[in-house]
Amino acid sequence: ITIVGGGHAGIEAAHIAAQFGLRVAIITMPGIGLGSAPCNPSVGGVGKGQVVREIDALGGIMGVLADKAGIQFRTLNDSKGFAVQSTRVQIDKELYSVYAEELISAVENITVIREKVNTITQSEPGFEITTTERSYRTSKIIMTVGTFLNGKLHTGSSQTMGGRVDCDKSEGLQTLFSAIKTTP
């Protein structure tokens, strides 16, 4: 399995697939840490807390990484009833990525490739992925491109293209979903 994108979703997918004994390659942009949090450095909260618990129950790693990289742990709505209370942790975003790198690199079945994906084409039986460095063939792809797919940054009244500040975008992938035929 090849996973395009090494953010939260990418490392979760890679970790779970490897637990099932599958060989996994994560292709992610160079210079960006695994599990990088692009915006808000919080994990949990009233809405996202449920998702984090579900990921944890399914064997995921977000909760483990958040516990290790946490700098503030808080129960929200603690003056209200249990139904609306939730745990939220503010994380050190750089430390979170460091721990994600350590955890993923320790898993034998996962290879991390730090290259920018330019194109993905469907070629039976599977796909050909062309990066800035070389081409790869794979039978299965999981796309977890996050904010990097046709990304646009708004700063005041100006707009620039990019995945987030100081990061490139994946312009070669923006037409991917309309070009690839999917089956339910």
What do the predicted segments below correspond to?
Residues 1-9:
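Beta1/beta-strand and adjacent pyrophosphate-binding region of the FAD-binding site
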